[in-house]
């Protein structure tokens, strides 16, 4: 194919011709670089770096640089419980109210006796800000800042008069530090004042329960020491320390009060380390000062080049596994913010590749083995009272953060989520017993670093009892991609525990035929049914609607998946056959997907409409995506009803809503619609550095949902068949996708031109039978030897594989 490489060369020559200063111009790779011609004015425009634990947002200012800092375990509060003892005594009455069509009575009783105490969770906090003050001249020009996704480094460059100034900023995983390098092309030109500032929580009811102290440490270091805030009666038990250590090359360096002053250096390297006393959700016994000192000891004596090389090598060991390239156009070489504006009326397919690659970057930067999972904002947060507390919301958002993790060949990055699910079983088993009188474990729609599990916020949100079940499906997905039986044995008790709860919790529908969850809800969306009136909620102190019901469609679909996964796990491991049979019989009695009188898939067991028909969630389409109950192949009779839901709710909404819609339309094989939604997302619900908006607050769920949606457009594997280009937009007539993973333990690389596969390669990691839909006849070869294949349907081939072997697919 006429590769992107040749197009890149063409546009480099074009820009050289039209730009008089071309000798000094940098032409960025459009699929792997976010770049801008001006500094960030707002936090939402800053560029992120992260190593899974330490995050920073870089503004790139030339007069007063701000680098906002986060350490992932700095939260309000401390270990606490939300369990309400004896709440289960009220459950039968609540269930009776719901079955009798008295939702407000059920809502109030649930609010009084089954809601968590305290009713809200804790907040993720900002750790500190680093400010660098420069005395620039009046001739600032040739400014640019960029994030290189191939290295994970943010760059800032500008000229002041005849001097070229450069900065490099990255977050090193090997050295657990944020590194800032300042240099210029002339000697003795680096001068600035630096201040490391703490941040206070000024806006909540426990004002003045947090504190910090700013100090200089010798002549070359600054530090902030502090304590987290109390919140909702939970004592702040996090102690933290952030320390900056400077190394100058030539020039002079000193501290003045809380400032570090550098004069006339050739270059300066700033090393920022941070730590808290957090050990786990129930242990805060570490010494944050010892941890910081240990980080500094380990990095002492290393050169900047060595630190940089180690960080880039580590980062690339994740990022370089996958490559997505789509055709470039002239607009592809615009600054990223201008590309986003131009997309509405111009061709720029590679912007989708950039969005996909940025999603992988965010996963690598916010979720590494041994860290916390990515929260609503990943690991980046400037506010002490952030939107939705920057917590873990599990009625869509946390799950969406990890939809792409396996296919994006970042399986290790799922480890923090898997660990969190295991940890939730601790308090989750208490909630199951005390709130519901059930065995196993349960978790609802919100949690925090302390792994609380009871219903949070209010009954309108908290009655989502399948949040833990949904998270548990991710444990099974990890197995499907890896086929690691040792891992499956490890998580089997977690999967079984979730199933055990619902086997106790499910009750018979009044028709005597179905089993349903009760109470239940369809996340955040009230049904348009009898008794669902606007009312004053005593738990939240708000006028609102109740969502409480029984047997919501999403509940039934999640449990259909969960029960099926458990049955398969028990069979694979040879465990609990009698219990697995009970689960199989219960699964058969779950409410099937139903089509309402308006032609849409019903959101509830009863044929009710929605009070918000443009709602941002698509809960009742879980079975289409990310679930596997509904598909064009298996349930063609439901496809029109699913499309009717998507048409009813439209292509707009929040960032996360649009990411979900992209994947849903991809499962319906309509790539043109998915791409149309992507364009609308870029125009209306993405910040200039491709972070998603949830209305206006920055969140990573939409960023990562879009990443998953793009992957789903190009390859699917949820039905046991590797389906290449299932939802390819007509405009993406050629491209390359390499290193992507699919279920069954396979890694794929393929190229296409004129909307048809031209080349494909498969690595078998587990030695399983490979079934692939490629759309053309082909030959399978390994080491030049032809492999026997069987055509099991039109364009679908099956062949045996050996673990660790590469197979070439030659298209005929």
Which functions belong to the PLM regions below?
Residues 1-25:
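Bacterial Sec-dependent N-terminal signal peptides
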Residues 24-460, 466, 475-479, 496-499, ...:
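Aromatic-residue-lined binding/catalytic grooves and analogous aromatic/hydrophobic interfacial grooves
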Residues 35, 373-391, 502, 508-525, ...:
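Short, surface-exposed recognition loops and adjoining beta-strand edges that mediate ligand/DNA contacts
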Residues 190, 350, 412-415, 485-493, ...:
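Short, solvent-exposed positions on alpha-helices
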Residues 378-389, 443-463, 520-550, 684-696:
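Acidic/His metal-coordination segments adjacent to aromatic residues that form catalytic metal sites
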Residues 477-478, 482, 486-487, 498-508, ...:
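Non-catalytic carbohydrate-binding regions of carbohydrate-active enzymes
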Residues 497, 501-569:
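Acidic/histidine-rich catalytic neighborhood
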């Amino acid at each position: 194919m006429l590769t992107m490489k040749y197009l890149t060369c063409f546009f480099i020559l074009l820009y050289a011709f039209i730009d008089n200063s071309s000798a000094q111009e940098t032409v960025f790779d459009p699929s792997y670089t976010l770049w801008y011609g001006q500094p960030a004015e707002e936090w939402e425009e800053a560029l992120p770096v992260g190593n899974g634990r330490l995050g920073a947002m870089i503004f790139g200012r030339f007069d007063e640089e701000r680098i906002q800092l986060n350490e992932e375990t700095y939260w309000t509060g401390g270990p606490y419980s939300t369990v309400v003892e004896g709440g289960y005594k009220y459950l039968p009455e609540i269930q009776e109210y719901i079955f009798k069509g008295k939702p407000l009575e059920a809502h109030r009783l649930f609010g009084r006796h089954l809601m968590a105490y305290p009713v809200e969770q804790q907040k993720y906090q900002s750790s500190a800000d680093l400010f660098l003050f420069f005395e620039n001249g009046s001739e600032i020009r040739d400014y640019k800042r960029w994030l290189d996704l191939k290295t994970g480094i943010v760059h800032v460059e500008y000229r002041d008069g005849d001097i070229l100034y450069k900065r490099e900023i990255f977050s090193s995983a090997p050295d657990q530090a944020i590194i800032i390098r300042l240099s210029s092309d002339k000697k003795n030109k680096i001068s600035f004042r630096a201040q490391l500032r703490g941040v206070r929580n000024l806006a909540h009811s426990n004002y003045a329960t947090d504190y910090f102290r700013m100090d200089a440490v010798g002549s070359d270091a600054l530090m902030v020491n502090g304590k987290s805030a109390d919140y909702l009666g939970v004592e702040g038990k996090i102690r933290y320390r952030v320390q900056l250590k400077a190394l100058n090359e030539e020039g002079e360096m000193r501290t003045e009060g809380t400032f570090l002053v550098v004069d006339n250096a050739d270059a300066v390297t700033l090393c920022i380390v941070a730590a808290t006393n957090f050990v786990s959700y129930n242990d805060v016994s570490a010494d944050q000062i010892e941890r910081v000192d240990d980080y500094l000891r380990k990095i002492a004596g290393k050169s900047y080049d060595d630190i940089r090389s180690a960080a880039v090598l580590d980062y690339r060991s994740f990022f370089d596994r996958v490559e997505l390239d789509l055709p470039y156009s002239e607009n592809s070489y615009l600054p990223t913010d201008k590309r986003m504006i131009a997309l509405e009326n111009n061709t720029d397919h590679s912007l989708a590749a950039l969005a996909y690659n940025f999603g992988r970057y965010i996963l690598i930067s916010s979720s590494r083995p041994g860290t916390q999972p990515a929260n609503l904002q990943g690991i980046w947060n400037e506010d002490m009272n952030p939107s939705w507390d920057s917590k873990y919301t599990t009625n869509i958002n946390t799950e969406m953060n990890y939809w792409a993790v396996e296919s994006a060949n970042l399986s290790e990055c799922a480890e923090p989520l898997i660990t969190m699910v295991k940890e939730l079983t601790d308090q989750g088993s208490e909630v199951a017993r005390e709130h519901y009188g059930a065995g196993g474990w349960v978790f609802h729609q919100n949690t925090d670093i302390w792994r609380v599990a009871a219903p949070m916020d209010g009954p309108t949100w908290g009655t989502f009892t399948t949040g833990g079940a949904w998270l548990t499906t991710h444990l099974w997905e990890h197995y499907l991609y890896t086929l690691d039986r040792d891992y499956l044995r490890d998580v089997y008790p977690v999967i079984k525990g979730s199933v055990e709860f619902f086997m106790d919790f499910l009750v018979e529908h009044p028709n005597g035929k179905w089993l349903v969850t009760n109470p239940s809800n369809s996340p955040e969306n009230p049904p348009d049914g009898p008794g669902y009136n606007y009312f004053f909620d005593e738990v939240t102190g708000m006028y609102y609607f109740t969502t409480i019901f029984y047997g919501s469609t999403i509940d039934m679909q999640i449990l259909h998946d969960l029960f099926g996964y458990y049955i398969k796990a028990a069979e694979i491991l040879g465990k609990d056959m009698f219990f697995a049979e009970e689960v199989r019989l219960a699964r058969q009695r779950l409410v099937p997907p139903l089509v309402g009188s308006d032609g849409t898939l019903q959101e509830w067991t009863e044929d009710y409409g929605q009070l918000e028909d443009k709602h941002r969630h698509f809960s009742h389409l879980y079975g289409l995506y990310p679930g596997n109950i509904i598909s064009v192949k298996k349930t063609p009779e439901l496809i029109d009803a699913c499309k009717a839901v998507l048409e009813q709710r439209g292509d707009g909404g929040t960032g996360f809503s649009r990411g979900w819609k992209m994947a849903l339309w991809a499962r319906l094989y309509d790539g043109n619609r998915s791409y149309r939604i992507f364009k609308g997302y870029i125009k209306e619900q993405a910040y200039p550095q491709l972070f998603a908006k949830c209305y206006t607050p920055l969140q990573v769920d939409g960023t990562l949902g879009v990443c998953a949606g793009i992957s789903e457009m190009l390859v699917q594997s949820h039905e046991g068949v590797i389906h290449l280009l299932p939802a390819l937009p007509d405009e993406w007539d050629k491209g390359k996708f390499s290193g992507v993973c699919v279920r069954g333990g396979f890694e794929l690389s393929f190229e296409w031109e004129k909307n048809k596969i031209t080349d494909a390669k498969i690595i078998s990691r587990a030695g399983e039978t490979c079934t692939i839909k490629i759309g053309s006849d082909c030959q399978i070869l390994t080491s030049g030897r032809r492999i026997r294949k069987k055509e099991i349907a039109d364009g679908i081939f099956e062949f045996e594989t050996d673990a660790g072997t590469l197979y070439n697919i030659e298209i005929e």
